[in-house]
């Protein structure tokens, strides 16, 4: 495995204790990645690295480009500011040493086209026979009348078919003609018990045992790098890997944690089951409720859209919803939860004293007044900590179990 010339490392590479000196020649990262690491063991390893760790900040234009691209792929809500900077640094190094002609500027969009097959009439399902038209019942031949079974233990299965012929007698005659011994029933039971015992003793080669666990870990820690790769990113974040793959950048795997394919995501409402590709929405565009969940989708060759749902029950976790909603309050400074998109809120504006600005060139400026803006601490808006009208309806705390600030700075 030839080492990559330039490698950008994420926090997951340091937490997994990856041998980056064997993966790449020049190791890059940003200072925010090192700041994220809090455990003592990893910090001790960072203090005595066997290679030179280079800190480099990405340019703002690449940060803006990666941010817009991640919004189109649907991974933007899953990425932190540090993750976006790591992606931007990888894009910047690729542009400096390789070029951007082979990189994608737009992700692969999910397009739904008309399908030849009707979705309500599935075809070619394994294990099922779906006739197009009901066939008339066929009459039973007179020459072969159905024989009634002698043993009625399995009568429910024998009603609709003739009993299968027993070929044990014919097999015994063939063995007698060849001169072979016919095993008795007791010998067959003993042989079967021995075979089962041998099968149970065989542990197989695919099991992980204390003797081979170190070898398996060494194989998993190997990083499969394709040839002719000059810039790559080592990360264990699947959202970052998805963005890198869709942009055309190289992802270096650590401990075998690598996504198989790039997926696109949409938002699906679990209330009205409508979907939207606008990943920046908070409320459903059809019913207006806050019931949107991210779902990965793939498109087949015939244009059929397949949505992949998670079996994890935490996806639709009702935590914090067991409490009843508070009674809606009226007035200008009421704090009501934001439940629907078209819910109206009063305009929370600052007081006049807080909105006073000093402009000596204004025609209505009164001389002699203090040129300093007064700090409003007595009005009700200042008491309720209303900072700006863009905040909407103030503190809309939906979950009573959410963490709160215990220590408030006194005025």
Swiss-Prot record:
Q: Which residues bind Zn(2+)?
A: 269, 272, 284, 287
Please give the Pfam families that the UniProt record associates with this protein. Answer: PIN_6, WRNPLPNID, Zn_ribbon_NOB1
Q: Where in the cell is it found?
A: Nucleus
- GO molecular function annotations of the record: RNA endonuclease activity; zinc ion binding
The biological processes this protein is annotated with in GO are: maturation of SSU-rRNA; visual perception
The Enzyme Commission number assigned here is 3.1.-.-
**Residues with Phosphoserine modification:** 184, 200, 324, 351
Source domain of life? Eukaryota
Could you state one GO cellular component term attached to this entry? nucleus
Query: Boundaries of each PINc domain copy?
Result: 5-108
The protein's predominant localisation is nucleus
Alphabetically ordered keywords of this record: Endonuclease, Hydrolase, Metal-binding, Nuclease, Nucleus, Phosphoprotein, Zinc, Zinc-finger
Instruction: Mark out the compositionally biased spans (Basic and acidic residues).
Output: 136-147
Enzyme class per UniProt: hydrolase
Listed Acidic residues bias regions: 182-192
Residue ranges of region Disordered? 120-148, 181-208
- Keyword Phosphoprotein among UniProt keywords: yes
- Enumerate the residue ranges forming zinc fingers (NOB1): 259-331
Function text: May play a role in mRNA degradation. Endonuclease required for processing of 20S pre-rRNA precursor and biogenesis of 40S ribosomal subunits.
Please state which protein family the record places this protein in: Belongs to the NOB1 family.
Oligomeric and partner information: May interact with UPF2. Component of the small ribosomal subunit, ribosomal RNA processing complex (SSU RRP complex).
The protein, known as? RNA-binding protein NOB1
Organism ancestry: Eukaryota, Metazoa, Chordata, Craniata, Vertebrata
Q: Which gene encodes it?
A: NOB1
């Amino acid at each position: 495995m030839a080492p990559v010339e330039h490698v950008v490392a994420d926090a997951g590479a340091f937490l997994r204790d990856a041998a980056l000196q064997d993966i790449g020649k020049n190791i890059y990262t940003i200072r925010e990645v090192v700041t994220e690491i809090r455990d003592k063991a990893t910090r001790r390893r960072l203090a005595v690295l066997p290679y030179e760790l280079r800190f480099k900040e990405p340019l703002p234009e690449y940060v803006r480009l990666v941010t817009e691209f991640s919004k189109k792929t649907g991974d933007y809500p899953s990425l932190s500011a540090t993750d976006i900077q790591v992606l931007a640094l990888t894009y910047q190094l690729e542009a400096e040493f390789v070029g951007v002609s082979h990189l994608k500027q737009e992700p692969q969009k999910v397009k739904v086209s008309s399908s030849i097959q009707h979705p309500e009439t599935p075809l070619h399902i394994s294990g099922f026979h779906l006739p197009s038209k009901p066939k008339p019942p066929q009459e039973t031949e007179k020459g072969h009348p159905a024989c009634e079974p002698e043993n009625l233990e399995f009568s429910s299965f024998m009603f609709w078919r003739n009993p299968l012929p027993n070929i044990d007698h014919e097999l015994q005659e063939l063995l007698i003609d060849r001169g072979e011994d016919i095993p008795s029933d007791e010998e067959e039971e003993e042989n079967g018990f021995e075979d089962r015992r041998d099968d149970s003793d065989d542990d197989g080669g695919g099991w992980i045992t204390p003797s081979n666990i170190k070898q398996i870990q060494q194989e998993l820690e190997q990083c499969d790098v394709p040839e002719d790769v000059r810039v790559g990113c080592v990360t264990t974040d699947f959202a970052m890997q998805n963005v890198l793959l869709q942009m055309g950048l190289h992802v270096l795997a650590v401990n075998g944690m690598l996504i198989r394919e790039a997926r696109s995501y949409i938002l699906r409402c679990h209330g009205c089951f409508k979907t939207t590709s606008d990943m920046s929405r908070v409320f459903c565009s059809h019913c207006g409720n806050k019931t949107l969940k991210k779902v990965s989708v793939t498109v087949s060759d015939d244009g059929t859209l397949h949505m992949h749902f998670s079996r994890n029950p935490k996806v639709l976790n009702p935590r914090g919803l067991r409490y009843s909603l508070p009674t809606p309050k009226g007035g200008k400074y009421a704090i009501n939860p934001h439940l629907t998109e078209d819910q109206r809120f009063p305009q929370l504006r600052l007081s006049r004293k807080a909105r006073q600005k000093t402009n000596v060139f204004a025609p209505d400026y009164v001389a002699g007044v203090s040129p300093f803006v007064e700090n409003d601490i007595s009005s009700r808006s200042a008491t309720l900590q209303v900072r700006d009208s863009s905040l909407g309806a103030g503190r809309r705390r939906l979950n009573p179990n959410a963490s709160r600030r215990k220590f408030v700075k006194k005025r």
